[in-house]
Amino acid sequence: RPVIYAGGGIRLSGALDEFIKVVEKLGIPVVTGWNAHDVIWNTHKLYVGRPGTVGNRSGNFAVQNADLLLILGNRLNIRQVGYNWKSFAQKAYKIWVDIDPTELKKPTVQPNMSVIADLAIFLPILLKVPFVKSGEKHQRWLAWCKNRLERYPVVLPEYWLSEKINPYCFIESLFNKLKKDEVVVAANGTACVVGFQAAHLKFGQRLWTNSGCASMGYDLPAAIGASIASNKGSVICLAGDGSIMMNLQELATIAHHG
């Protein structure tokens, strides 16, 4: 019952293409962590969820029932593993691949096998390794994970019955309308948590959050940076009423530079 737990190190290493090739070669269910929302799209046949304390149920079901967890460029912070980290993926043999040896020595989750490596080097090597193709048991496991993804949706039908706008319904509607190459930058709080849970990401979309230090005020400056980096391309900024006030002066930057 293997699961790949993808982290932000995949994009940081520049090895996104190799990552997709590896998971499709192995045929292993994939879950994504903070800052790795968009390393795989929702309709991919191997995507099964986003685990963690603010993740979705299908992702947590996959991790907690896995017997092998391949952790790629993911530092497994508290939001990923929970405050009772001793119960995290208890049944799984954990192979943790990270470029930073300090992350592998934290007093929380302990790997069964530590691999200190740059994913830009590790993933191409893994691609060359021969392997036995998955059998019937593995296919049943993948089907079980996909079933949980369909059986436990984040946005429930009753959410749409509210007279006021439900943030989960809003995020689902927004991402359904976005094009496949759109960029979204989210503030801290509801903007990023609901986005992490409910965003239905398409191939090529980017979703940026400040999950590391989680400070308010990140959204507007980051959206400006994302737009400049894409030659003043279109960027959707999701800002809370408190967060946007932290850097409200950046509206002048937008007005000045157009």
Question: How would you describe each model-predicted region?
Answer:
Residues R1-P2, V22, V63-N65, S173-K180, ...:
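Glycine-rich phosphate/diphosphate-binding loops that line cofactor/substrate pockets in enzymes
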Residues G8-A15, L76-I78, K164-P167, S243-M246:
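Active-site glycine- and acidic-residue-rich loops that bind
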Residues L12-D17, K21-E24:
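Glycine-rich phosphate/diphosphate-binding loop of Rossmann-like nucleotide-binding domains
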Residues V31-K45, H200, K232:
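Conserved catalytic cysteine-centered active-site region
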Residues A36-W144:
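Glycine-rich, acidic loop regions that bind phosphate or pyrophosphate groups
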Residues S58-N60, N65-N77, C192-G258:
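Thiamine diphosphate
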Residues K146-P221, A226-S227:
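Active-site diphosphate/adenylate-binding microenvironment
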